[in-house]
């Protein structure tokens, strides 16, 4: 007996379930445009035809450029994570400011504390991500 996916709605996934935020997808596309040669070199790997048998010259890609591109890609991921957490931090700050300026803010004190804990979490994520990216760029 064949079962179609349309008869089982729990197995269907909407396309919107897998969408990434706009700024993350834009930063990934910028990363692909800037570092496309690095990704190509990384996927190509070091082959035997890179070395010339009569001149013994090394291709300049083999002298650490692949290693360099991995670190740049990791630093870019840290910066993307820091950007995401900073945007979430600004959104949460806007909510907290709205709660504080409303007339009935004492009734939503529990919600206020939840939002403050989110702010601390986003600050921690942003700080650690920026620290990681800065340390990687310093060590390059």
From Swiss-Prot:
It is found in: Membrane. The chain crosses the membrane at residues 63-83, 119-139. It comes from the Eukaryota. It is a multi-pass membrane protein. Its main location: membrane. One of its GO terms (cellular component) is endoplasmic reticulum. Keywords: Membrane, Transmembrane, Transmembrane helix. This is Uncharacterized protein C1271.08c. It comes from Schizosaccharomyces pombe (strain 972 / ATCC 24843). The lineage of its organism: Eukaryota, Fungi, Dikarya, Ascomycota, Taphrinomycotina.
